[in-house]
């Protein structure tokens, strides 16, 4: 399950692009907290801490503004087109016990049968879970699966507090036969091509002579 990350914040009292640039120059990030019908709360967040927290899109943050905590999840991160810089963050307020719809990464474990290979067709699944009990990933066990077998979204084991939102028939893992490349034929073709080439006739002139 994800941990709640406490982030210190200050209220934003000025607005405009110029002010936002000055904020980012001081390794801070402008952000807004909204949701549940409350007035949007504009804040300034610490850049390094938020850069780390934003690596997990389902992280639950406890934004501490003047001693008051605000539980929130990252809704959107606006990044610079070229530089590794966060320009702005939208945070969605959540409440303890509230269920949220999130995308969870799929982790494959185990090895298929020796005569087979597996292909991951879907890297994430959409689920509904308690905001404070969102799993970091969903495990898909492919141990000893044979050629022609499949794992669908409905086959993935979910924690007790999690329900599937994605299409149950969504293909997650496909087990197939390895595709063999006939290197013998390719080698013969190359040899035939080489035998068919005729050496270029010498003109007696050095390359680059235009006289």
From Swiss-Prot:
Region of interest called Disordered, as start-end residue ranges on this chain: 175-211
Cross-referenced Pfam families: Ribosomal_L25p, Ribosomal_TL5_C
UniProt GO BP: translation
InterPro entries referenced in this protein's UniProt entry, alphabetically: Rbsml_bL25/Gln-tRNA_synth_N, Ribosomal_bL25/Gln-tRNA_synth, Ribosomal_bL25_b-dom, Ribosomal_bL25_C, Ribosomal_bL25_long, Ribosomal_L25_dom, Ribosomal_uL5_bac-type
UniProt keywords, alphabetically: Ribonucleoprotein, Ribosomal protein, RNA-binding, rRNA-binding
Comp. bias regions, Acidic residues: 179-194
Example of a GO cellular component annotation carried by this entry: cytosolic large ribosomal subunit
Keyword Flavoprotein: no
GO molecular function: 5S rRNA binding; structural constituent of ribosome
Subunit structure: Part of the 50S ribosomal subunit; part of the 5S rRNA/L5/L18/L25 subcomplex. Contacts the 5S rRNA. Binds to the 5S rRNA independently of L5 and L18.
NCBIfam families in the record: bL25_bact_ctc (TIGR00731), PRK05618.2-1 (NF004131), PRK05943.1 (NF004612)
HAMAP family: Ribosomal_bL25_CTC (MF_01334)
Function statement: This is one of the proteins that binds to the 5S RNA in the ribosome where it forms part of the central protuberance.
Similarity field: Belongs to the bacterial ribosomal protein bL25 family. CTC subfamily.
Protein name per its UniProtKB record: Large ribosomal subunit protein bL25
Organism placement in taxonomy: Bacteria, Bacillati, Actinomycetota, Actinomycetes, Micrococcales
């Amino acid at each position: 399950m994800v941990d709640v990350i406490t982030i210190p914040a200050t209220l934003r009292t000025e607005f405009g692009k110029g002010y936002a640039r000055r904020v980012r120059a001081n390794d801070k990030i402008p952000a807004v907290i909204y949701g549940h019908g409350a007035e949007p709360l504009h804040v300034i967040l610490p850049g390094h801490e938020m850069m780390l927290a934003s690596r997990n899109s389902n992280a639950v943050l406890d934004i501490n503004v003047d001693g008051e905590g605000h539980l929130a999840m990252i809704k959107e991160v606006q990044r610079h087109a070229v530089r590794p810089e966060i320009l702005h963050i939208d945070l969605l307020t959540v409440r303890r016990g509230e269920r949220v719809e999130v995308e969870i990464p799929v982790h494959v474990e185990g090895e298929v049968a020796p005569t087979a290979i597996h292909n991951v067709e879907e890297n994430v699944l959409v689920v509904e879970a308690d905001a404070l009990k969102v799993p970091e990933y969903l495990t898909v066990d492919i141990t000893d699966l044979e050629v022609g077998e499949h794992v669908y979204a409905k086959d993935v084991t979910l924690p007790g507090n999690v329900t599937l939102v994605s299409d149950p028939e969504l293909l997650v893992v496909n087990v197939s036969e390895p595709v063999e490349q006939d290197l013998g034929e390719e080698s013969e073709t190359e040899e035939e091509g080489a035998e068919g080439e005729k050496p270029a006739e010498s003109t007696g002139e050095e390359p680059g002579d235009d006289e």
